[in-house]
């Protein structure tokens, strides 16, 4: 009888522990769902795009960033879409780079095409490197095109380890498209050139990447190839996204490509090179990828 009672006590205790664990998991899931809903419903009006990213491939170190997009126009206006974008990057050797920009977009062709232009100012706070850029973009559900031109504003300045560095002029062109039947992915190709200073050779190269957009986070992998003066490298980027009510559905589409409305992308971030590419004195060293 005593042994039977002990077994009952153990059984009841196990059921209680299991029940409490299940309830704790349910409470945690409900809390996270409610928290995400709160962020999307409340912060989404202020910042339709907000994200935190971690990426590798920058001098074998991890780069962290936070980025937000804030509308300056009525969020329901599809003719005059005005917004500002700000970001802060913490890169190699604790370099802090601040990016501030303003952009204007417009929806065309029954909201199936989004075109825009933007201006940006970049400032590497630690060593006072400064740069500006102008860009244009065209976005649809079947492909995208982006062109950015960068202008170094600061001259030679004393950088890390008292080495002279200079922000470079340059440009990049990017085309992208989702994989067939997978509209929640994006395959992109980017070509870039940075103009060498003081007689140094220009740096040219390209980059391919594949991004998967899940609910609440994105994962991107790619490879950057240079023309020989700088080592090629692979990179991985993980981004936590917030405040977007229109989450991409994961699945296989009935058609390879379909032209649909991109009105939900009015306030997506401007894709550009946010880190300042610099040349070291008497050499060419890319610190800004």
Regions found by a protein language model. Give the residues of each.
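Solvent-exposed loop/turn segments connecting transmembrane beta-strands
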Residues: 54-64, 88-99, 123-130, 195-204, ...
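Extended interaction regions within the primary functional domain
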Residues: 43-51, 56-59, 75-81, 102-104, ...
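Flexible, glycine-rich linker and terminal segments associated
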Residues: 25-43, 153-188, 192-200, 213-220, ...
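Outer-membrane beta-barrel initiation region
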Residues: 25-95, 271-272, 278-289
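Transmembrane beta-strand segments that form the barrel wall of outer-membrane beta-barrel proteins
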Residues: 47-56, 79-91, 113-124, 134, ...
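Feature captures outer-membrane beta-barrel proteins of Gram-negative bacteria and organelles
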Residues: 38-39, 62-77, 96-110, 132-149, ...
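Classical Sec-dependent N-terminal signal peptides that target proteins to the secretory pathway
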Residues: 2-24
